[in-house]
Design a protein with these regions (language model features):
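Conserved short beta-strand edge segments in small beta-sheet-based binding/regulatory domains
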Residues: 75-87
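RNA recognition motif
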Residues: 69-73
Length: 104
């Protein structure tokens, strides 16, 4: 599994409710994203940062999703993103009570 953390700056004039609306507008497309297991939208009012935390089945799926076009889309919609990829060797799931060890 691969976890991708994306952050970007939000202008101070964009309210939390407007940002939430923007997030809800895009949420349906993630139901159709190949290889995506989960996406969490992120927002920090104190630092005016937002973004997403994505869990992908594999590195290839993550790389295909975060291509040049996707980065340009994020930049146009919000601002230039910082994108970090992490291997996810162990996952603890409170909902199922399971610990998954997909390894590296």
């Amino acid at each position: 599994m691969i976890t991708v953390v994306v952050t970007f700056s939000i202008p101070s004039e964009v309210s939390a409710s407007v940002l939430e609306e923007k997030f809800l507008e895009t949420a349906p497309m993630y139901l159709e994203t190949p290889g995506l297991v989960r996406k969490n939208y992120l927002y920090d009012r104190a630092t005016l940062e937002a973004g997403g935390c994505y869990t992908f089945q594999d590195k290839k799926s993550a790389e295909l999703w975060f291509n040049e076009e996707r980065i340009a889309w994020i930049t146009e919609r919000y601002s230039a993103p910082d994108i970090r990829h992490f291997e996810t060797p162990v996952i603890v799931d409170q909902d199922t009570g399971l610990i998954d060890n997909p390894g590296y």
